[in-house]
Regions:
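Structural transition elements
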Residues: 121-154, 172-180
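Extracytoplasmic/peripheral linker and loop segments enriched in polar/acidic and small residues
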Residues: 111, 191-208, 212-214, 235-265
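Second-shell loop/turn segments in exported
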Residues: 31, 86-90, 97-100, 133-141, ...
Length: 265
């Protein structure tokens, strides 16, 4: 039963003596503490002031496994991270430019550098833990900077173009170190002539402003599933009118053909 709730601080639950099944719950008290900073969560865990936590940055895994007082328990991930491209920014309106960006980013190297063995690349918009819903016909773009350069030239940008790339100001499982990951993305894009300017702002403004007309040119975000159905990943992003991406007018993305497929699915 709930005995205390301090928003942004902690929730305290105590054993309900009137629970319908004798012997349960098996613990007398649970305290859920809000510790936003990953480093602070890890410090609290190592100090013994909390018993367990989640969403520790992958870079701390070796440190965790080396501590005899701690156990690292692995579970399948249930989230995806993505780079959203705004088609109202002229270069990004061309499919070849978007394809070039996909081919210019060395996703496997970035995953290895920032997630280690805790992350994978995937061409689907659902996590690999939902493989039963993933079609083998869907493949990811290859890492091919030369082909990416050729596509940019075909689209009329042989010398590249300027791009503002926004990164999240907070850590999330899908982007545990967003600034550093954004820097890696910028380095890959610079290799094909795209001149990236990194931007960020406070989290509330980031979420609100990313798709307000004209919207961010490109931004990093992700999604952690609420339940085990691909609809929970696809609908919030692509099913109009609730789609949480943008179109050239800064409104929700609405693609009739895609809507029809999602509804049928």
């Amino acid at each position: 039963r709930l005995v205390e709730w301090r928003p942004g601080d902690q929730i305290v639950l105590e054993r309900n003596p009137n629970f319908w099944k004798p012997g349960l719950p098996k613990v007398d008290r649970l305290v859920f503490k809000v510790i936003k900073d990953p480093a602070a969560r890890l410090a609290a865990l190592k100090a013994g002031t909390i018993d367990f936590t989640t969403d520790i940055p992958p870079s701390n895994l070796r440190d965790l496994e080396a501590d005899p007082n701690l156990d690292a328990v692995f579970r399948p991930s249930f989230n995806v991270g993505y780079l959203a491209l705004n088609p109202s920014h002229k270069p990004l309106a061309d499919k070849r430019v978007r394809q070039a960006i996909a081919m210019a980013i060395n996703k496997k190297a970035i995953v290895q550098a920032f997630w280690g063995r805790l992350g994978v690349t995937d061409g689907h918009f659902t996590p690999p833990s939902m493989k039963a819903f993933q079609s083998p016909k869907v493949t990811d773009y290859e890492f091919n900077p030369q082909k990416a350069k050729a596509l940019l030239a075909q689209a009329g940008y042989p010398n590249g173009f300027d791009l503002e790339l926004w990164y999240m100001p907070v850590s999330r499982p899908y982007f545990p170190t967003p600034k550093e990951i954004a820097e890696a993305l910028a380095a890959d894009l610079s290799a094909i002539g795209i001149r990236v300017k990194l931007q960020t702002k406070d989290w509330a403004s980031y979420l609100a402003d990313r798709k307000k007309s004209p919207g961010f040119q490109a931004y990093m975000l992700g999604w952690t599933g609420d339940y085990g159905d691909p609809q929970n990943f696809y609908d919030p992003h692509f099913l109009g009118p609730i789609a949480d991406l943008f179109d050239p007018q800064g409104k929700n993305l609405v693609i009739p053909e895609l809507n029809e497929l999602l509804v049928k699915g």
